[in-house]
Every structure is written in structure tokens, then in C-alpha cells.
Amino acid sequence: MSKVAEVLEIVKGLTVLELAELVKAFEEEFGVSAAAPVAVAAAPAAGAAAAEEEKTEFDVILTSAGDKKINVIKVVREITGLGLKEAKELVDGAPKPVKEKIAKEEAESIKAKLTEAGATVDVK
């Protein structure tokens, strides 16, 4: 059995506390650090970018009806299929979601229609 294989077998038999002691001993003996601060700092940024790329469902939030409330109610009815009363309640109760968990293209299209009607809209 080679030296490397022997050391590996010994390490396999160690407890977690013994492994922690071994790491400390290596750090002291060879003047190195087991921590990798550069890799740890870069990981969250990469993770955040991946999370943004993976987002496939969006919510269209009506934040304000603006001055042309009647036009906004008409567009909300067209988009949601709600009745007049329900659409008016949604518009009056802003900020409220108009549509949830939809594709980005559809969300942008709805935002454009509502903005054109005079509303203030967020896509999240």
C-alpha cells in the first residue's frame, strides 16, 4: 500500500473533531490557510445572477391608476376578463397584482397596455 493510500485510510477513520485538529495542524505546520475567501466572495454574486436568469414567471403589479382611471379599468377588464365592478375594485385598490406567474413577454405586453392607458405598473 502506498503512503498516500495509507494516509487516506487513516483520514477516513478520523472523527470530525480529529479532522478539525488535523486541519489546524496543517495550517500551523505549513503556514497556509484552509479558507478560500476569494471563492466564497464570488459565489453569492454568481448565485444571484443565476437566480435572475432562471426567473421565468413574472407578476404585473398595478401601482397607480393615474388620471385616466376609466381607460385603465377598460384595459384591466380586457386583460383579466373581470367584470366592471371587479376591475374597478382592483384599480381602486392599487397597488394590486393584475396578473401573476406569467411569461416575461406577456408581462411586458400587459405593462405596455396599462402604461399606454395611463397607469403606473411594475413587473416583478
From Swiss-Prot:
The record's listing under SUPFAM superfamilies reads: ClpS-like, Ribosomal protein L7/12, oligomerisation (N-terminal) domain
Q: Name one Pfam family in it.
A: Ribosomal_L12_N
UniProt KW keywords:
Ribonucleoprotein, Ribosomal protein
Q: Does the keyword Ribosomal protein apply?
A: yes
Q: Which terms does the UniProt entry file under GO BP?
A: translation
GO MF, one example: mRNA binding
Superkingdom, taxonomy of origin: Bacteria
Cellular component, GO, one term: cytosolic large ribosomal subunit
List the CDD domains: Ribosomal_L7_L12
Quaternary structure and interacting proteins, as annotated: Homodimer. Part of the ribosomal stalk of the 50S ribosomal subunit. Forms a multimeric L10(L12)X complex, where L10 forms an elongated spine to which 2 to 4 L12 dimers bind in a sequential fashion. Binds GTP-bound translation factors.
**The protein's role, per its UniProt record:** Forms part of the ribosomal stalk which helps the ribosome interact with GTP-bound translation factors. Is thus essential for accurate translation.
The record's annotation in HAMAP family points to: Ribosomal_bL12
For this chain, the family text in UniProt reads: Belongs to the bacterial ribosomal protein bL12 family.
Q: What is this protein called?
A: Large ribosomal subunit protein bL12
Query: According to the entry, what is the taxonomic lineage of the organism?
Result: Bacteria, Bacillati, Bacillota, Clostridia, Eubacteriales
